[in-house]
A protein has these predicted regions:
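S-adenosylmethionine
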Residues: 1-440
């Protein structure tokens, strides 16, 4: 099969449907097909446009498929989705989208489906979604917000007035959020350097020390990135790390650190002194942290493969601990559209809650009296956030909720059990954090 951006996008979509991990799959396919420049950008745009609008695309296509999409072979299904995405959302002429889709059936050895692909797309590309009649509000949200049933039901129940916007809201103004490396440049100097390189819309964010910018390609492809002038980290994530209030000379633990963005901010706050233990449960993810630390030039970080649900004698008692725990990810649905289709299985949710609680209990044992523990997630699920903190305080009366020194951006919902960022209210990712003080 000859390499071309449409074929690469379809191949990646087939694999993503089977395996998940959208960004890793796309990167691997782009490298395999040796795509660069515009072809690489076009393939990426098709891939993410399909993920972002899959619910809408599937609804339209199924109006013209009596047996449904599920009965089709995976390559044919993804060829249809990719072509409709191009015509509907990417300003590709209908004729070009349809003709290239028919060619792809031959490339993927599905020539027998070429007639179906041609007929379905010629009708689907002109479908008027305004004429759709939905069974109920859940189906409307699934189609117009492009979400699976479980996520749609969760949002409709917990955030009924914001549900659709939560699914599609572009956090950080649709820009990339960065953090300057103080070993190389302050915020103003970084903004000047980025602007001089032609990066557009460079400005300071609402979180102290954050920078927002619009890159033409990947921010990791910039020479300034390779030289360690900045790292990429969402504003909400930066806020959580700032609430740790790490200081020079202290012993600090980052228990669930990969890929390392918050570790870098903590090292910055410590002015590259003291000792920062940056941990993750998987060795390959620990290597991501090491790579980031080396690129930025911090020397006060020790990386460690560690299961944070267990006490590790290799870890010392700490002055401050960050526990950015595994979570359902329901706060970053616009950023990671594949999460919109996840199954919210009660048994798996119970396991996740137990893991979060175990990590909190480990942190409680490792923290010195008078120390600061920050718990954070990238979800807007109350069970994983406020209710998790309430249960922790019941188990650990030696802790109380603390008020961080950093000012929360407008729109944060602050309760007795922590602070919540909902994208539509703060302009940042959906995120929860709670600062806790160990009183004895």
């Amino acid at each position: 099969m000859a390499a071309n951006p449409r074929a690469a996008a379809v191949a990646a979509l087939v694999r993503q449907e089977q395996d998940g991990f959208s960004n890793l799959i796309l990167d691997a396919e782009l490298k395999r097909q040796k795509l660069e420049g515009r072809d690489k950008a076009f393939a990426s745009a098709i891939f993410y446009t399909v993920l972002e609008h899959r619910g809408t695309l599937d609804y339209i296509l199924e109006q013209f498929l009596p047996k449904g999409l599920a009965k089709l072979d995976a390559p044919v299904r993804e060829i249809l989705r990719a072509a409709l995405a191009q015509a509907r959302y990417m300003q590709v002429p209908v004729s070009a989208a349809v003709n290239e889709a028919v060619k792809l059936t031959r490339s993927f050895k599905k020539s027998s489906a070429s007639g179906l692909v041609n007929a379905v797309l010629r009708r689907a590309c002109t479908y008027d979604l305004d004429t759709a009649v939905f069974r109920d509000d859940i189906e409307r949200l699934m189609v117009l917000g492009s979400a699976g049933r479980d996520v749609a039901e969760f949002l409709h129940k917990n955030y009924p007035d914001e549900a659709r916007n939560i699914l599609t809201y572009k956090a950080d103004g649709g820009l990339t959020s960065l953090r300057a490396n103080p070993l190389k440049a302050n915020v103003a100097a970084l903004c000047e350097k980025l602007t001089a390189l032609g990066v557009r819309e460079v400005r300071q964010g609402v979180v102290p020390g954050s920078v927002l910018a619009r890159f033409e390609g990947s921010p990791a492809d910039q020479e300034l990135f390779r030289q360690g002038y900045y790292h990429v980290e969402g504003q909400a994530s930066q806020l959580a790390a700032l609430c740790v209030e790490a200081k020079p000379g202290e012993t600090v633990l980052d228990l669930c650190a990969a890929p390392g963005g918050k570790t870098l901010l903590l090292a910055e706050e410590m002015q590259n002194s003291g000792t920062l233990y940056s941990c993750d449960a998987a060795e390959n993810r620990v290597q991501l942290i090491r790579t980031a630390v080396e690129r930025m030039g911090f020397t006060n970080v020790k990386t460690l493969c560690n299961d944070a649900t267990q006490t590790n004698p290799a870890l010392p008692q700490a002055d401050r601990i960050l526990a950015d725990v595994p979570c359902s990810g329901l706060g970053i649905l616009a950023k990671k559209p594949d999460l919109r289709y996840k199954k919210l299985d009660p048994a798996r949710q119970a396991e996740l809650l137990a893991t979060q609680a175990a990590i909190l209990d480990t942190a409680a044992r490792l923290l010195k009296a008078g120390g600061r523990l920050v718990y954070s997630t990238c979800t807007i699920e109350p069970e994983e956030n406020q209710l998790q903190i309430r249960a922790f305080l019941q188990r650990h009366p030696e802790f109380c909720v603390a008020e961080p020194a950093v000012a929360f951006p407008a729109g944060m919902t602050v309760t007795e059990y922590g602070a919540l960022s909902v994208p539509t209210r703060t302009g940042m990712d959906g995120f929860f954090l709670c600062a806790l003080q160990k009183t004895r």
